[in-house]
């Protein structure tokens, strides 16, 4: 088994309940916040265990002389290694363990795990500053959900977006394929009446 054989499974969206949200920016009046989606290091480990349980490893090396606990992580999946730096947050959570978790998530993104979260649209929501949480959590768009959580048209929309991710295909048949999926997605939202239904008698 090669990395290319499991790439799509590694890159697959996580269930909505596994995606957490944290404020990236809060307005001066503390009434609204720009929410950022993220996953836990355990989600990364679970994904790796599900896809290639005996073919991945993670190593960390402490980076000396930094203000916050910092490590260099190396994630190896099916013989391919990716490295990145992990840094612990400020405050009580600033531990080497937190830095290692950060490094694991950053390395995992290089394999496509959770990378789609960086493509989410900006989501500003009402912010409850007393509770330090959003009044209502943001909603994930259709394409950022696993198949079983999508609406009937969601799968078609994802197919079209996959083909348009980099550029509009020049091949006429591929253009027709994109159009077919977009039409099916829109049709699921606004079903087209069949036959003479809706016509004047």
From Swiss-Prot:
One GO term of the biological process aspect: DNA repair
Keyword set, alphabetical order: DNA damage, DNA repair, DNA-binding, Stress response
Induction of expression: Induced to high levels following extreme ionizing radiation exposure. Also highly induced in response to desiccation stress.
Any one GO molecular-function label of the UniProt entry: DNA binding
Pfam families to which the protein is assigned, alphabetical: Rad52_Rad22 (PF04098)
InterPro entries: Rad52_fam
Family to which the UniProt record says this protein belongs: Belongs to the RAD52 family.
Subunit and partners: The truncated form (1-160) of DdrA forms heptameric rings that can assemble into a 3-ring structure.
Reported function: ssDNA-binding protein that contributes to the ionizing radiation resistance of D.deserti. Plays a role in DNA repair and genome reconstitution, in a RecA-independent process, since DdrA is essential for recovery from severe genomic fragmentation as a result of exposure to severe levels of ionizing radiation in an environment lacking nutrients. In vitro, binds to the 3'-ends of single-stranded DNA, and probably protects them from nuclease degradation. Thus, DdrA is part of a DNA end-protection system that helps to preserve genome integrity following irradiation or desiccation.
Description of its domains: The N-terminal domain (1-160) is sufficient to pilot the oligomerization process and to bind specifically single-stranded DNA, but is not functional in vivo.
Protein name per the record: Single-stranded DNA-binding protein DdrA
Annotated organism of origin: Deinococcus deserti (strain DSM 17065 / CIP 109153 / LMG 22923 / VCD115)
Gene: ddrA
């Amino acid at each position: 088994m090669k990395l290319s054989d499991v790439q799509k499974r590694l890159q697959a969206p996580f269930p909505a309940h596994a995606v957490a949200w944290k404020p990236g920016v809060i307005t001066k009046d503390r009434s609204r916040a720009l929410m950022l989606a993220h996953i836990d290091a355990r989600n990364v480990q679970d994904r790796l265990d599900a896809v290639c349980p005996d073919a991945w490893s993670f190593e960390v090396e402490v980076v000396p002389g930094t203000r916050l606990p910092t490590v260099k992580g190396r994630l190896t999946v099916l013989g391919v290694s990716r490295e990145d730096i992990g840094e612990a947050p400020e405050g009580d959570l600033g531990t080497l363990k937190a830095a290692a978790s950060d490094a694991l998530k950053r390395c995992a993104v290089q394999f496509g795990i959770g990378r789609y979260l960086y493509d989410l649209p900006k989501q500003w929501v009402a912010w409850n500053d007393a509770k330090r949480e959003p009044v209502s959590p943001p909603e994930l768009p259709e394409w950022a959900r696993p198949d079983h959580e999508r609406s009937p048209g969601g799968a078609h929309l994802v197919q079209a977006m996959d083909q348009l991710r980099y550029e509009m295909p020049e091949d006429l048949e591929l253009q027709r394929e994109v159009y077919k999926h977009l039409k099916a997605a829109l049709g699921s939202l606004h079903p087209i009446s069949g036959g003479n239904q809706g016509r004047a008698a």
